[in-house]
Regions:
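N-terminal export signals
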Residues: 2-3, 8-25
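Alpha/beta-hydrolase superfamily serine-hydrolase fold, recognizing
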Residues: 9-10, 26-306
Length: 306
């Protein structure tokens, strides 16, 4: 699948529309009238990726092993603190030129699991081009509220803008993240240092999350649902590619499609990129492979930012 060029960036979503048969087959999810009729078990299932991807943990273990190799090969700028929390740390991988663009990748885990160390392997295509990459950690729920997590990501970007040059990174930032990291990418897109973004399989409407097992740790408030749901906020006028796998849970598919439509209504630029047959985990291979659609998307965004 060819990458959408800059002149076609805003209108590209029409070429990536899901077939009507897929859309009509979706189960009741966020904002559907049927959502309120579901049992708690059905609501939990609507957002439980591990229940439908049987090898999700094995895939994550492979990412971790590959990432450990990269960290061992480039140990000079890892575990750099940007705040007081134990997880408030950066792993920086500077490129050949300090002014090269930098991919900042935010990890997923529904804001309550995983860590930045698992995901260094997704910087490989960028590093192979001589560009920079950086991965921030953040405090997980329930030790932090979602309000605090969103602020920590912004604090991390503040630190990188102020201190990155001391570690060989002073170029423009392209922000990306997967799952919860996709949500955090959307929430930090307006940061002054960010030129553009790639949000992968994100959650952009938090209302239904409050009705699931995920809220046992998040404990979302009415104020947070309103203030931290990207779907409820004005579109940021920076390029944001929004992507999902066509084999993902219908709730996640709907989140991405509705968020893109919401941005398009406000003329915010960026394509919607469905990845055929990809589930919540296998979609990430499109970012790790140099020829993957998501890797090529990131490359184009970085080239355009330089």
């Amino acid at each position: 699948m060819a990458f959408v060029h800059r002149r076609a960036f805003v209108t590209a979503s029409a070429a990536f529309a899901l077939p009507p048969s897929f859309a009509s087959a979706q189960a009741p999810v966020a904002n559907n009238r049927g959502w309120g009729m579901l049992t708690r078990a059905d609501r939990d299932a609507a957002y439980n990726n591990n229940a439908v991807v049987s090898d999700g943990e094995q895939i994550t273990e492979r990412w971790g092993a590959a990432s450990a190799r990269i960290r061992s090969q480039r140990p000079q700028h890892i575990d750099l603190p940007y705040g007081r929390g134990d997880r408030n740390k950066w792993d920086l991988f500077p490129g050949d030129n300090p002014n090269a663009p930098c991919l900042v990748y935010i990890h997923g885990g529904y804001w309550q699991a995983r860590n930045r160390e698992l995901y260094s392997c997704f910087a490989e295509p960028v590093l192979a081009r001589g560009w920079s990459a950086a991965l921030p950690g953040y405090t997980l729920a329930p030790d932090a509220t979602l309000t605090q997590i969103v602020q920590e990501v912004r604090d991390a970007l503040d630190w990188l803008a102020a201190q990155g040059s001391a570690h060989g990174i002073s170029g423009p930032v392209i922000l990306s993240g997967w799952s919860a990291g996709g949500h955090l990418t959307a929430m930090a897109l307006d940061h002054p240092s960010v030129r553009a973004g790639l949000a992968i399989s994100g959650i952009y409407e938090l209302g239904p999350i409050r009705d699931t097992y995920l809220n046992e740790r998040l404990k979302l408030t009415d104020k947070e649902v309103a203030a931290l749901s990207p779907l409820r906020l004005p579109g940021v006028g920076k390029p944001l590619a929004i992507t999902y796998g066509t084999a993902e849970l219908p709730a996640l598919v709907r989140n991405s499609r509705e968020y893109h439509a919401n941005r398009a209504r406000s003329h915010a630029p960026g394509p919607l990129i469905p990845v055929p047959r990809a589930n919540h985990y296998t979609i990430m291979e499109e970012l790790r492979s140099p020829n993957g659609i998501l890797a090529r998307t990131v490359m184009r965004l970085m080239e355009d930012s330089a």
